[in-house]
């Protein structure tokens, strides 16, 4: 496992949020049926993803969208 700077981790998270943020919010909205709660759940999803962002940067996560969706469902 490589060692990454905080800047690298933040850039990676920003990239994931840009690519998948809307999809995660929509899915959370379907599950929760409340857009305020869906926004909170989406935010929590990306916080949890950040805790494991090194795994994604190391290439251990092959399908980042599925990974994020699974985090959201478990949130």
Give residue ranges: language-model regions.
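Short alpha-helix-to-loop micro-motif enriched in aromatics/charged/Gly
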Residues: 55-60
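Structural recognition of an alpha-helix C-terminal capping motif at a helix-to-coil junction
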Residues: 40-47, 51, 62-74
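Short amphipathic alpha-helical interface segments enriched in basic and hydrophobic/aromatic residues
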Residues: 18, 25-29, 46-54, 73-74
């Amino acid at each position: 496992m490589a060692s990454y700077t905080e800047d690298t981790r933040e850039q990676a998270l920003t990239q994931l949020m840009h690519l998948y943020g809307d999809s995660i919010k929509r899915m959370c909205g379907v599950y929760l049926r409340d857009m305020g709660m869906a926004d909170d759940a989406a935010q929590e999803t990306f916080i949890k993803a950040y805790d494991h962002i090194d795994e994604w940067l190391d290439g251990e996560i092959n399908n980042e969208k599925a990974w994020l969706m699974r985090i959201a469902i478990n949130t």
